Amino acid sequence: MPTLRKRGIKVTPENRRGTILGKGRQHIDWQYWCHSYYDYVSPDEYFDTHPEYFSMKGGKRRYVYNGGEGQLCLSNPEVYDIVEKEMLRLIGEHPEKKYFDFSCNDNFWVKGCQCKECKKLDKAAGGTGMGTLLPFLNKLARKARAVYPDREVYISTLAYFHTLKAPKGIKTEPNVVIKLCSMPGDQGTSYLDPGNGNAREFHDMIAKWKEVTDKIVVWDYVVNFKNLLVPFPNFGVQRDNQQFFEENNVQGVFHQGSRDEGGESAIMRDYILSKLMWEGSTMDVGGEVSRYIMAYYGEAAPEVIEYYNATAANLAKSSSTLGLYDNNMSHWFGYLSKGNVRRYEDIINRAYDKVKGNEEIESRLDYLRLNVAYAKMLLPNIGIKERNEAKATFDRLVDEKGITMIEELSNLDKFNAQYPMMVTTNVLIMLSPLILVILIALIVGIVLLVKRKKKRKS
């Protein structure tokens, strides 16, 4: 039997399409899943006549800001009335649903409404957007129970960006569910025994939220949104993370990876995390990864296992974080160093040699070759010929595999347009210490030369 009441995963397009078709059935109990403010209070319907319903930012009411959606003014009683009416309608029309989400929109730049009343409530709760949101949710939850006493109805929300921090002096109603996002998070060290500040912060965040609610669903990020194709060795922490969730009585976990074609190790990550959520922390993740690789890569399996072990070992050796928005340069002297990337390339080449002529296995190995080529072509300290060869491999494989997204919000065309400047910038960053030393030496030389000339004149 599964250890989690709610299990979800989004790491491959196939997984996402299956959910849309009703096969994955991940959020079947949810009316909305996330970022739902405007599903209740639409700016198209209300902004022109009631701008006060929407977030204040920079002294103005806004429903969009910096390319993203704004938020709602949750201290406005009329906003509550509109949301309550719509929420009760949805509950009544969807008896098959248990969870009805009301959560902030996805815009880092708009941290809630900044009107005087909203700021006062958030400040009183310890400087968190939950100061306005949680009382709002609790009121909805009480109303839902009163109107539908014979139904199991929960009101859910996201603890995300400005609502991430647990509030002081407020507890949730028994039918409120908090979906806590693993931010800042770190996929290089486990939450069970955090080895750095990012993992420790999320570890402690769970403890603080447990004082507020006993219904937590963790939204866990298992991806580098900045570099969807770079090697991302995070399998080693997953069993301990699962144990941490179980020990803290987490009700559910949703693992989010890349939603686009070709995400790094996406198919294996989908399988391993799905199985882990079902079996629980007693599962031997390392053994399951090896079994998967042996079944999927055939005679090339020993080299593929060697590759995954090498990336994980080199990350551990570097003691670096494995973050959600890591730039490759943060690992140039770690697991993505020139020497390490060349070693990965050698391992993958040996894997191809093992299965030469087996087009199916070669096609599967192509994704690993693509990941290594991507890491290599962004290195600042390789020759032009080697870089061009890596870029040519990358270009061929993304075309063959139909890969169009490099970052969560940046496509292949944009990446290719920026690539020459990225390489130049990377080289300059790598050379900057040397350039600084040369400049200092030149300045010192000029100063000494001027002093000598002055002495001669005197």
Question: What feature does the model see in each segment?
Answer:
Residues 121-139, 173-192, 245, 275-283:
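Acidic, His- and aromatic-enriched active-site or binding-groove loops in soluble protein domains
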Residues 276-429:
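Catalytic domains of carbohydrate-active enzymes that cleave complex glycans
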Residues 83, 102, 144, 178, ...:
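Conserved, mostly hydrophobic/aromatic
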Residues 75-81, 89, 197-302, 306:
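Structured mid-domain segments that build the active-site/substrate or prosthetic-cofactor binding neighborhood
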Residues 443-458:
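C-terminal membrane-anchoring or membrane-association module
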